[in-house]
């Protein structure tokens, strides 16, 4: 279980994978057939594959092996029982397949947002499950791009990608420089024509269906961290605040 080929699966934490193997790009682990398929479709390079026998024999398993053969030729493929895979990964696997993949250089914010119309900006969303859920919602609602501050969980963390159902490979995103947030980033967004709205609980917050927002050509929706929400300085830098009405005091 501790061969060099399996080291990336059982001896490195995800934050180490980001820097240890290739400081400029690093690696990540994609989990589950659907997530792996979407990562391959997005052009991410597979480096090795670890899977249960039942997954290797499944239709999606054969599809994944076929796609990998097309784009990368031969890579290490290890087949084992669910118990062995769970021991290697350190937790119970429900979907029986892990793929080590190479990260790509992140795009610049200007390139990502130049032609977009609707973007989401995440400020210090630290839980990978929440990041994944936001990406899934962003994909469903037609958000063109997502910007994340440096304090956010990595969208390519295993849990984030799994919860997103692989949409982290479909919705373009990048991580902002800490020194640029929020003042410089807000200034850049305005220069690109964005109307910025903070999702915040304030008495003067607009409803999402407010007429003021109907004809906004380019909209940047700013969402804050779990619990505390957006920082006061961030809210002050936005053009408007928006609040989704909820019953029973739920916020």
Place the predicted regions along the sequence by residue.
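RNA substrate-binding interface of SAM-dependent RNA methyltransferases
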Residues: 74, 78-79, 83, 105-204, ...
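Glycine/small-residue-rich loop that forms an oxyanion/phosphate-binding "nest" at active or ligand-binding sites
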Residues: 65-94
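Anion (oxyanion) recognition and catalysis
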Residues: 40, 69, 190-191
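Short, acidic/turn-prone active-site loops that include or flank metal/cofactor-
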Residues: 54-56, 82-84, 151-153, 178-179, ...
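Structured adenosyl-cofactor binding patch, chiefly the S-adenosyl-L-methionine
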Residues: 97-99, 137-141, 155-168, 232-251
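Boundary-proximal intrinsically disordered activation/regulatory segments immediately upstream
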Residues: 1-66, 152-153
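Active-site/ligand-binding-proximal alpha/beta "capping" segment
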Residues: 197-250
């Amino acid at each position: 279980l501790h061969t060099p080929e399996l080291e990336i699966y059982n001896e490195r934490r995800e934050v180490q994978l980001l820097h240890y193997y290739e400081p400029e790009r690093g690696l990540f682990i994609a989990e589950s057939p659907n997530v792996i398929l979407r990562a391959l479709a997005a052009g991410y390079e597979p480096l090795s594959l670890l899977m249960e026998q039942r997954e290797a024999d499944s239709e999606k398993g054969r599809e994944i092996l076929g796609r990998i053969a097309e784009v990368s030729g031969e890579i290490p493929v290890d087949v084992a029982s669910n118990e062995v895979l769970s021991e290697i990964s350190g937790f119970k696997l429900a979907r029986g397949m892990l793929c080590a993949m190479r990260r790509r250089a992140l795009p610049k914010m200007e390139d990502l947002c130049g032609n977009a119309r609707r973007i989401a900006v995440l400020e210090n969303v630290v839980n990978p499950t929440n990041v994944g859920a936001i990406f899934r919602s962003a994909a469903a609602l037609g958000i063109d791009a997502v910007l994340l501050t440096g304090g956010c969980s990595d969208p390519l963390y295993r849990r984030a990608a799994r919860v997103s159902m692989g949409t982290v490979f479909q919705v373009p995103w990048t991580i902002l420089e800490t020194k640029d947030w929020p003042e410089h980033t807000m200034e850049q967004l305005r220069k690109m024509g964005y109307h910025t709205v903070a999702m915040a609980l304030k008495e003067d917050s607009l409803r999402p269906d407010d007429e003021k927002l109907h004809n906004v050509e380019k909209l940047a929706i700013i969402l804050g961290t779990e619990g505390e929400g957006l920082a006061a300085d961030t809210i002050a830098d936005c053009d408007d605040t928006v609040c989704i009405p909820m019953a029973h005091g739920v916020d």
